[in-house]
Amino acid sequence: DSDPSRGLGDVYKRQILHRIKPVEGRLEKIGKLKNNSRVILDYAHTPDALKSAFLNLKEQFPNNNINLVFGCGGERDFKKRIMMGKIAEKYSNKIYLTDDNPRNENPSKIRKDIKKGIKKSNIYEISNRKKAIEEAIKNLNTGDLLLVAGRGHEKVQDYGKRKILLSDKKVILQSINSKNKFLSKNFKLNIINCL
C-alpha cells in the first residue's frame, strides 16, 4: 500500500502523465515519415544499452525492420567494439556504421574493430555521421524503424583537437523533412500516372 498514486483520480493521473517529458536522447521518437517509418534517437553507447534499446523497440514494434546508425567512441572501452558489432548484427536489418566521437583515435580503426563483430553484408560504412544519417533516412522503406545510437542529445562531435557542431536530432529532422517532400512528390506523380 505504498503506491504514491493511490487516492489520485484517473483524470488527475492522466493530466500528470501528459506533462512528463521524455528524457532527451533516450529512445526519443524524433519523427514519423509519410511512409509510416520512424526515427528514434538513443544515447546507447555500451553493449547493454544498445541491446536494451533494440529489445525495447522490438517489444513496441514487433513486426517492423530496425535499421541502425552507430559507431563507437574513441579512447574508450576497446573491448566493447566487437560486442557492439555483434549486437548490431543480431538485432538490425541494415547497419550504417559511422563515426561517433573518435577523439584522438583513428576513426577508421574504430570502425574496423566494430566490423570484426559483424558478418552480414548489409552494412554501409559512411564515416561522415551527418551523411550516414541522411542516407539511412533516405533509404527507409514503409514501416521501417531507424535507431540512431551513440550520441543522443550531444551537439558537438569530438575529433580530438577538432570539434564539429553536429546534432543528430537536427540532422534527423532535416532528413525527415526532405524524405517527406520526396514521398509527397512521388505520391502526386503516382496519382497523375494512374489517371
What label would you give each PLM region?
Residues D10, Q15-L195:
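ATP-dependent carboxylate-amine ligase
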